[in-house]
Amino acid sequence: MLYLTNYTDYMFFSYISVRAGFAFFIALFLSLYFMPKFIKWAQNKKANQPIYEYAPQSHQAKSHTPTMGGLIFIFATIVASLLCADLNNFYVIIGILCLVLFCTIGLVDDLGKILKKDNHAGLSPRMKLLSQFIASFICVFFLYIMGINTEFYLPFYKYALFDGGIFMLALWILVIISSSNAVNLTDGLDGLATVPSIFSLLSLSAFLYLSGNAIYSSYLFLPKIQGLGELVVLSAALVGALMGFLWYNCYPAQVFMGDSGSLSIGAFLGYLGIVSKNEILLLLIGFVFVLETISVILQVGSFKIFNKRVFKMAPIHHHFEKIGWVENKIIVRFWMIALLANIIALISIKLR
């Protein structure tokens, strides 16, 4: 879409906000259009979500729900981005690469579970982690050789603490892998991971746009990073695609995103946190994902060390199911927590 400015004096399509809006609606339309077709195809092929044997009893009714819906919204995101974003911008190219790599990892994992009708039959934990490490390394290596800012910032503080240089690659890999797995753990109830992901993308988009603008970044004491604002187009496309997906994923879900969706969303959130220099603030932006991950760590650690469980079941959303909360109540309350956390994160823009 940006190329249209080369053939006319009308600069309408040169504005990031305009192209982000087009990307949003294109991805939304593609997601809404192709998702029901995919659902019908997946039902015919019996590409259903295998249910964990220890999951709450209410989940057994979901055993016939198709999965791998992430393929559609990632496809919609990439198509909209290719049409609307500046493909000469290396932040955009690496962002698309990140989505493709992690969607592929998730797809392999999903297919293994579906073909064997076993929730444990996908990639082994070791193989999944190795695949995520390789994919993360590819992304951060390209970022580094392209000269990305390697300074380290803390939330609510206007100056960089230090320049980590090449050692920042280790932190960036950790951020992407952790974020990817955190969203994956959260994706256990209808729409639970989708809406907090949208909130996180919107918050990060604000940081991307402001840091990419010389005037705003200087006024707000944000890192000034040329070209970063172009990622808002890619982020807006994913928001639109996720909203289209949510139409079919809200309770009771007609389709699940699968690992192909959750792993790629999480990795992309981690990527946006890295390039916008919000590696630490990402803990607040993705607070619900962090909460879910911590609950699993506490549960596993406590059981291995003390042979006792902290929660009735982990991740923590299953704990609330076990104590009698209905699914919709858990989902909406977690959405509220995610919204509040992102509001606080956005306040940090001014409080520096």
UniProtKB/Swiss-Prot annotation:
Gene Ontology cellular component annotations, sorted alphabetically: plasma membrane
Disulfide bond positions: none
Protein name according to UniProt: Phospho-N-acetylmuramoyl-pentapeptide-transferase
Pathway(s) served: Cell wall biogenesis; peptidoglycan biosynthesis
Protein's cellular compartments: Cell inner membrane
Pfam families registered for this protein in UniProt: Glycos_transf_4
Primary location recorded for the protein, binned into one broad class: membrane
Reactions this protein catalyses: UDP-N-acetyl-alpha-D-muramoyl-L-alanyl-gamma-D-glutamyl-meso-2,6-diaminopimeloyl-D-alanyl-D-alanine + di-trans,octa-cis-undecaprenyl phosphate = di-trans,octa-cis-undecaprenyl diphospho-N-acetyl-alpha-D-muramoyl-L-alanyl-D-glutamyl-meso-2,6-diaminopimeloyl-D-alanyl-D-alanine + UMP
Molecular function GO terms recorded: metal ion binding; phospho-N-acetylmuramoyl-pentapeptide-transferase activity; UDP-N-acetylmuramoyl-L-alanyl-D-glutamyl-meso-2,6-diaminopimelyl-D-alanyl-D-alanine:undecaprenyl-phosphate transferase activity
Topology within the bilayer: Multi-pass membrane protein
Keywords: Cell cycle, Cell division, Cell inner membrane, Cell membrane, Cell shape, Cell wall biogenesis/degradation, Magnesium, Membrane, Metal-binding, Peptidoglycan synthesis, Transferase, Transmembrane, Transmembrane helix
Keyword presence, Cell inner membrane: yes
